[in-house]
């Protein structure tokens, strides 16, 4: 079965055991790509099991995909951040890591802006080069921006938490609805893989390093510690529903079909 996820340390750490057959589960063919590329691919038949931004899922993917409970990314203090070269108001041209990423959705909490889409790992350099005025950072960017001389303007996750009083759901693992019969076993395999990662944290070190954008071991360790947590074992369904409802009220998402289950 094709299994698509990102090359970021939290994913390669969490799914290493499943990909390498170290836990019971289906044999998988991994496909690693940037989260926005995964979001786009999720709308195609090629996506059998895939990581997908919650925001992208809500943009009309619910009719073809259903969410699994294990393997997602959520929590407190995990949100995207807006940074710039110096302290200023959020505005001007803002780089985002994709139109349908959860990061882009969360930026709407602050208003409507002129945005420029680029790969998440190019945003810091674009700000430093003056190509954009601000940028929304995800993944390792939370840990590297200060070292590059950038300044924090807003933590979008904190804004969400203060408004919604629940963890921030960033992404989930989804499976095609026509493969629903395989969903429970895949969900169990994901959970087993995450538990294996917790129990054997050094086992995936080489795999994680081979795919990481940021090679600093300290950054990689901090990334994993923050993003791989109890919600990776079981995504908070209430938090996901809060995000979908908020997006519908904002007019960002189409109304979800109430007859289609959100989770397996």
What annotation goes with each model-predicted range?
Residues 1-2, 64-73, 93:
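A structural signal for short loop-to-beta-strand junctions that line the ligand-binding cleft
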Residues 250-264:
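Conserved C-terminal helix/tail region of periplasmic/extracytoplasmic solute-binding proteins
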